[in-house]
Amino acid sequence: MTEEYSNLRSNVSLLGQLLGKSIGGHLGEEFLDKIETIRQLSKSSRAGNQQDGVALIDMLTHLSDDELVPVARAFTHFLNLANIAEQFHGISRHCDSGVCAPEPIKDLISKFKNSNLSQQEMQQSVNELKMEMVLTAHPTEITRRTLIHKHIAINDCLSYLEISDISDKERDLLLNRLEQLITQAWHTNDIRQKRPTPVDEAKWGFATIEKSLWQAVPQFIRDLESELQSGLGLSLPLEASPITFTSWMGGDRDGNPFVTAKVTQEVLLSSRWVAVSLYLKDISQLTDELSMDNCDPALRSVVGDNAAEPYRAILRKLRSELKETLASLSATLQNQRSDEKDIITTSKQLKEPLLLCYHSLKNMGMNSIANGLILDILRRLNCFGINLLKLDIRQDAERHGNTLSELTRYLGIGDYNAWNEEDKQAFLLQELNNKRPLFPSQWNPSAEVQEVLDTCKVVAQTDPEALGIYIISMARQASDVLAVQLILKEVGCPFRIPVAPLFETLDDLNNSAAVMKRLFAIDWYRGYINGIQHVMIGYSDSAKDAGVIAANWAQYTSQEALVKLSAENDINLVLFHGRGGTIGRGGAPARQALLSQPPGSLKGGLRVTEQGEMIRFKFGLPKVAVQSLNQYAAAVLEANLLPPPAPKQEWRDVMQQFSDQSCQEYRHFVREEPDFVPYFRSVTPEVELGKLALGSRPSKRKPSGGIESLRAIPWIFAWSQNRLMLPAWLGAGTSLKTLLNEGKKPLLQEMYQHWPFFHTRLEMFEMVFLKADEELTKFYEERLVPKELWPLGQRLRDNLTLTRETVLETIPDHQLMQEQPWIKESISLRNPYVDPLNMLQAELLYRSRENGDEICPVVDQALMVTIAGIAAGLRNTG
């Protein structure tokens, strides 16, 4: 690495040396020398020495069974440690300017000052700032929670080590602690022995709140308020909740048979239990702090004249109620009878006494105390409520259709699934307006239908404050939305949970505005939504369906159409972005991603999924979380107050041509090429990925299905493992080359320089090209793929090369990642450590498949370690 990153290089070197010491102590210096030889050969091969590349392959393919797991683990652990050092560097006091995001709120304030925005416009936008992060347990978080805790402790040690006046003794103690942690990690099994349950996944989400976000959220709001006040004279209302968190863990049952109504109920209770326990700690600490005896008349009238410590009198009662609530929740979770006397069931019960104390402190001139812990607790309440995380419910549209189909057949009125859309809507609206029950009391539905009904009953019996929205995956028609609302009505849901269609395929995205227009034309529906409509935009499945370019353009144009339609109907539209960390799933840095959205699309707030390993990278440490939230807040405010101009018509025409041709090229390979599926299955670890205990959800929607039933996440994950990265670029090269050949290069460069959407798209390609490696993919092919399929592999690799060349020809400086030199440097650092894992993985896949049905535990374990290591090295893999 260059001198510019010397502090980061120093930390990477330190952690690497300590890892080497741990490995040498365990397996001996001779083994450590072998690891060093592999490392040096890989670096030399990366630098262009083909002879060393051959020697590296020879060395890795001739490892004994006893060496397979330790070699894989050595490189995987180094990459994990490099990730820790890099994450720490982003919040370090020695962070290089090219690595650390400049303070985004300060930068934004400068832009606002140079604009024609009025104080009122800015204040209104600040008041309306709303960001909702939806945490999901998609199966990409490779690292075990046990190791994550050790990684956090390593980060803490690095933080203490950079204190300038640390004594030699303190430094030695910290280095000793670092060595202990790295040695503990080395001697800990990297791979989960069994799949996590949905409840386990939910607890992982709770831990992220407890360990990081509980501290980060009030600090973020404090920083935001301070910057806005000092820079623009803007205030943040006390009741403001610019950030909230929701979860899919325990609520997302789309294709996951393990998420049952019972599981959802348990997760809801567990979430509240964690929240109450955290508030109990806060209130206990606040009780210690608020020992003052001066209070205002409002507080005195509540506690009485004899209370010597009025604040403590209020807080002790609150503490007692929290203890009772915790005991009641514990009993319920253990299937015991609970005493529900004096328990807290709403945020209001907790907030009102705290507000009484807060205003009293203000009124008595104790502003510094009022602006301390009690304000932090109030802001936590605004963010987390009494439930910690709201829970979204997600279910496939087909399951609701099957429920109504079974019902109508029982009633003898036909088969709902066989009706056309008009007949479905007529039936649904008739029953939605009918006061008599539709479900017969003697009806005994099938187990699958009963599960749908039980889930809706859980929704009906849950405090609305604990729920987010109900999402319908693979939504295609207005009836898909009305069907959910009818089922909820029939199970007795007393409130109107927002119901959001999720448009996932290319056709469904293009048809989304027409579907919503039909719904907005229904009087009953307009009354139900009360002026607010949630719509979810699918990124991963649309890219898998049509290729990344066509999917991105459909996402953009569908959002434009939905924004326009909602404005015409005076409806507040909340777009929910189902993005991931990979390019094939919409992954891009927060600011770039948000500012490349259509103008006006963030007016209703930001709602976005944070998935898998990205939760840890963005929110795993309090300082990192504050940084991430600042970036999101600045981007949303900028997008709403200083939106990018709408694209010119000629840009749109070029983009449409790019989209159409890239979709055709993508589908030609994926759908029409007869060798594609067998090639995919043999050249990637797709089958083996199904064995890895990643998440609770199966990798396929239907166990017997082919590519079309494979979930988008394992589809992308498999291609990233062999470094072809196919979902992130396939289809783009040929279509872009056609545009260049038609003389549209000046127009494409104009789009790159002046249209954030197009600029971000090409920049994401640039990052993919730094991670992709045709030669490594070719090695997988030669080791694993039948020779008759090799010509297809060559065509795909040639296509990648063409795509890289055409993107380089299009961008003005003709070099990859010139605007993001740190990302380029980071990838260059990792590649020599990821490459041996790829070569070893190909060898392990070969050995595993040669064994047939015979299980070889050593080979399988080593294979799983390489999968984890490559994921760590590539970072945004799922």
From Swiss-Prot:
GO molecular function: magnesium ion binding; phosphoenolpyruvate carboxylase activity
Cofactor: Mg(2+)
One term under GO cellular component: cytosol
Active site residues according to the UniProt entry: H138, K544
GO biological process, one term: tricarboxylic acid cycle
Key word Magnesium present: yes
Keywords: Carbon dioxide fixation, Lyase, Magnesium
Enzyme nomenclature, EC number: 4.1.1.31
UniProt superkingdom: Bacteria
A Pfam family that the UniProt record links to this protein: PEPcase
Catalytic reaction equation(s): oxaloacetate + phosphate = phosphoenolpyruvate + hydrogencarbonate
Assigned protein family: Belongs to the PEPCase type 1 family.
Function: Forms oxaloacetate, a four-carbon dicarboxylic acid source for the tricarboxylic acid cycle.
Protein name, UniProt field: Phosphoenolpyruvate carboxylase
